Regions:
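Predominantly soluble domains enriched in secretory-pathway, periplasmic, or organellar proteins
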Residues: 34-468
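Gram-negative bacterial Sec-dependent N-terminal signal peptides
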Residues: 1-32
Length: 468
């Protein structure tokens, strides 16, 4: 019988204890690994929207209101940027409806741009990314070189156009969501900006359907008419310039989410953009009647061109359109109604407005998502100048007389004046939510803006801008 020495038995006891400790440690690590891989959310639909607590744009150093929706009740939400938690003290917790509200302060040194904010959730786990845009601050300048005259009109101003023949201005307005019951087409005297005539559109078909609210506007001096888009009814209407009498109300559904309407008087054709689709609908402006549908094919694989803003240059009979979703521009021959080219817009995120300079064949494209104006060679598609104009660069008008582009920056509340080489000549304060601008062919600019609320003294105005 062999008996192990005492030292050997002691060694076995040490080995057993060590083995047990190792197994316990491994078990703990395994448990920890399992806990970090908790059951994922099989039906994750959480989304977060950010808006400024004060002002009209998110800026460096400003406070942001977060509105979270679609989360699982009780779900814990942590936000981070570059691996740094933005709510390190405590996770946000979704309420019984799966929502949460919170505020967050943007660092003073935050760079302008769209920042990828990572959403990490627990109980159950999930992850997503949402873009948080921090807009640049472009200082006001050049006010001493311009004379601005502003007049308050009616609630909900959208677009403005002018008659080269009479000088009269035509302005559209609409208030609220469907069914829209407050909407007007205005005719203004350009001398004092007083309302000469105003019309509430006819009732739209259907029970409690509101009116044929007017949004986009385009003047046709050859036929003495003014075209409007009825966005909520997906169609267009034509009125007389003289007394705003209705010439024709086209049937609902003809132009899905009709946004912009422009007229080539020499060709006697009108064109309306079907927003967020690849389609533009052309009309015989004299009859008036539908001509055809023009479809723009995107160059981005698997994506669809989503036209919103559109411009017609009658000197070259070309249509220019931009795609909100694919960041592309299209050139269309208004005579043949054929798409000539489609190209990517370098430096643009969610482009909205477009204008053209026939002398240089340059496009001026505003991009709301990147807060800039892109000056693009229409022949090559190359971006020649990338100009930061301010929060929410929305629309642009080019004046061939003064050879300047005028950009309405919705979030910044400004009108930026830029030359064809990308130099900012002025940045003028324009009031709340500048929406649209037009040039009259004589070097005068008219811009309209919307109000932030009923008591906003700087909203719902038309402003005449003239160089001194």
């Amino acid at each position: 019988m062999n008996i192990a020495p005492a030292s050997s038995a002691k060694g076995r006891r040490v080995f057993s204890v060590t083995l047990l400790a190792t197994l316990l440690a491994l078990g703990g690590q395994a448990a920890q690994a399992r806990s970090s891989f908790e059951a994922p959310d099989p039906d994750y639909h959480g989304e977060i929207k950010a808006s400024p607590v004060t002002g009209t744009a998110i800026l460096a150093g400003s406070e942001v209101a977060l509105d979270g929706r679609g989360f699982t009740p009780g779900q814990r939400i942590t936000l981070s940027r570059g691996g740094v938690a933005l709510n390190p003290d405590a996770a946000y917790v979704a309420d019984a409806q799966g929502n949460f509200k919170a505020t967050l302060r943007i660092p003073e040194d935050a760079a302008p741009g769209q920042h990828p904010i990572v959403i990490s959730t627990a109980q159950p786990s999930g992850a997503a990314v949402f873009p948080l845009k921090v807009s640049p601050v472009v200082p006001l300048s050049g006010a001493d070189a311009y004379s601005l005259t502003a007049v308050k009109l009616v609630p909900g101003l959208y677009q403005v156009d002018s008659s080269a023949k009479t000088g009269a201005l035509f302005v559209t307005s609409a208030v609220g969501r469907p069914p829209v019951k407050v909407s007007q087409l205005l005719k203004l005297d350009p001398k004092d900006l007083a309302i000469e005539r105003q019309l509430t559109p006819a009732a739209a078909p259907g029970a409690d359907a509101g009116v044929y609210a007017v949004y986009g506007v385009g003047v046709d001096d050859r036929n003495g008419t003014v075209w409007t888009t009825n966005t909520r009814q997906n169609t267009v209407a034509v009125y007389r310039q003289s007394d705003l009498g209705l010439v024709k109300q086209f049937e609902p559904g003809l132009v899905p989410h009709a946004h912009t309407v422009v007229v080539d008087e020499k060709l006697e054709r009108a064109f309306a953009s079907a927003a967020m689709t690849p389609d533009i609908v052309s009309f015989d402006a004299k009859t008036p009647a539908v001509r055809k549908h023009i479809t723009i094919e995107s160059g981005v694989r698997g994506e669809q061109f989503a036209v919103v803003g559109m411009h017609l240059d009658p000197t070259v009979h070309k249509l220019y359109a931009v795609s909100l979703k694919t960041n592309e521009a299209a050139v269309i021959d208004a005579k043949t109604e054929q798409v000539e080219k489609v190209f990517p817009i370098q430096g643009a995120k969610t482009p909205m407005g477009v204008a053209h300079d026939p002398q240089t064949d340059r496009l001026f494209i505003t991009a709301q998502g990147s807060d800039n104006l892109l000056i693009v060679d229409a022949k090559t598609g190359q971006t020649l100048h990338n100009v930061t104009t301010g929060a929410g660069a929305l629309n642009v008008a080019f004046d061939p007389v003064k050879r300047l582009a005028y950009v309405t920056n919705r979030g910044a509340g400004t009108l930026t004046v830029v030359d064809p080489d990308g130099t900012i000549k002025a940045n003028l304060e324009l009031g709340t939510y500048p929406n649209h601008a037009v040039v009259d062919g004589k070097g005068v600019v008219y811009a309209v803006n919307k109000a932030k609320g009923q008591d906003d003294a700087e909203g719902d105005r038309i402003t005449r801008v003239m160089a001194k």
